[in-house]
Amino acid sequence: VVHWARDAAEACEIVARVARDHGVDEIVKVKSMATQEVELNEALAAQGISAWETDLAELIVQLGDDLPSHILVPAIHKNRAEIREIFRSRMGAAGRPAPDDLTDEPVELAAAARQHLREKFLRAKVAVSGANFAVAETGTLVVLESEGNGRMCLTLPEVLVSLVGIEKVVPTFEDLDVFLQLLPRSSTGERMNPYTSMWTGVTPGDGPQEVHVVLLDNGRTNVLADEVGRQALRCIRCSACLNACPVYERTGGHAYGSVYPGPIGAILTPLLKGVGHDAQVDSLPYASSLCGRCYEVCPVQIDIPSVLVHLRAKVVDAHRDGRPKGQDLAMRGAALLFGDGRRLAYAVKAGSLANRVVSVMSRRTLPGGRTAIGRIPGPGASAWTAARDLPAPPRESFRSWWTKTDGGRNEAP
């Protein structure tokens, strides 16, 4: 059964309705950013249905009442000692408890999670997944993962619901073949993912006997209408841009306040949600130094810096109220000045003269014989120069020197 969900509310209601129709009060989930985007877990919990994450990192985040901080490794901000404490204190309330003698050895932590999840896999009647790709020519859905939990969710329960963003659709298996090689190399550095699962509807007597596919819009058609921003829909969620970004490296994923962190989140979230309504969303296009490293590593060549600049312009436009602000007036003045060479030359001469006057009034000598301008009276300038020294202006401007020496060709030795 194929469903269309215009927004998050419709998507959550479709999944909840399937769960209610089968009389279940819990489901198991494959790691899916689309379900996080629509806040599916919270919506199901409001209707008395528990949604259990089965990806190890997502399980850690869920048991710790935390939020993911990375697209590929959601619990990267947790060390193994913290994970041990989460398992020991929280696992029992969600199902099979962790062993009393659990240590922080990775092998033991993985074994505790495996035993805890196995009971849920065997008990669950309904599973929810996303999809990395959907093949239009056959209706096949594809999930790539590394732990095997996805395959358990896709084969053991009687009912499977897959929530898929409409941008995940590729035309043919030939197109899919390209992405199956591209994604693992860009995300984990592997030639292929350990588990690649594909399913095309129901196979009698094998796997889920009822399959629902929910095609999710939730702002994607609006993004498609944006000629600059639409390239963000090419994202395959490899997280290469996060790993290269100096801003993400220093702030972490939680600082973005978004399901999608990092450079891709800085453009995807404002595109999906729109700007001008939420201060946190409006701040995301500015969470970048525009260094371009994200563009260099992106396997699908999303020009993230260009989209960031595009979104910054949209944020500015969204907050205009008809009255020019100080920044607007300053930018208009700068455009008027720098847009004409003669005006700029006059301004340089006037500025040089003013600087000389101020320099004479406030000049002071720094160690090493260098001169600088000390405190300047007046609004604005006094606040800046009270704690900072400004370099003393040269007696001759660059433009004047260039004209006099023909670019240095006639300069005396």
PLM segments and residue spans:
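Predominant activation on well-ordered alpha-helical scaffold segments within soluble catalytic domains
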Residues: 41, 174-177, 181, 239, ...
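Secondary-structure junction/capping motif
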Residues: 55, 79, 105, 172, ...
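Short, contiguous, pocket-lining structural segments
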Residues: 168, 233-237
